[in-house]
Amino acid sequence: MKKKILIVEDHHDCREILGLLLTKIGYHVIKAQNSKDAIACAEAEEPALIFMDMELPDVDGVKTSAMLKQNPKTSHIPIVALTAWMSELWRKKASKVGIKTYLLKPVSSQTLRETIEEFTDESLIRANAV
C-alpha cells in the first residue's frame, strides 16, 4: 500500500511539481493550499507525513503545524517544513511546535524519498507517540 503524503503549499506550480515528483517515486499524494485545507485533509486522510510550506496565505506553517500537533487526530503525523529560506528564529519556532526538520526548495526526489522514509519508520512513529 502506498504511503499517503500531504503537501501543504499555496503556490499552485510548486504544489503540482512536488505532487508529480512524489507520485512518480511511488507515493499517494494529497494536496492542500492553505491552513484550513491542511487540517481538514490531515484529519480525513491520515497521511504518513506532511510537507508544510512555511508561508501560507491564511495562517503560517508554524502555527498550522502547532494546530495539527495539538489535535489528537493528527498529533502523531510527522511534519517536515518546506521553505525557500529558513532563519534561525524560524528554525527554533518550527522545532518548538514539533516540526521534525526542514528542506530548502527546490528539493530533489531522492531527498524527498529519504526524508519520508526517515520520518515514517514505524518504530519512530511509536516512539514519538509516547
Predicted regions and their residues:
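The feature encodes the CheY-like receiver
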Residues: 15, 57, 75, 87, ...
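Active-site beta3 strand of CheY-like receiver
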Residues: 45-51, 56
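Alpha4 helix (beta4-alpha4-beta5 surface) of REC/receiver domains from two-component response regulators
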Residues: 19, 63, 86-101, 114, ...
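Charged docking surfaces used in two-component/phosphorelay signaling
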Residues: 16-24
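Short amphipathic alpha-helix used as the core "switch/output" element in two-component signaling
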Residues: 40, 62-75
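Acidic catalytic/metal-coordinating carboxylates
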Residues: 34, 60-63
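Conserved acidic carboxylate
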Residues: 9
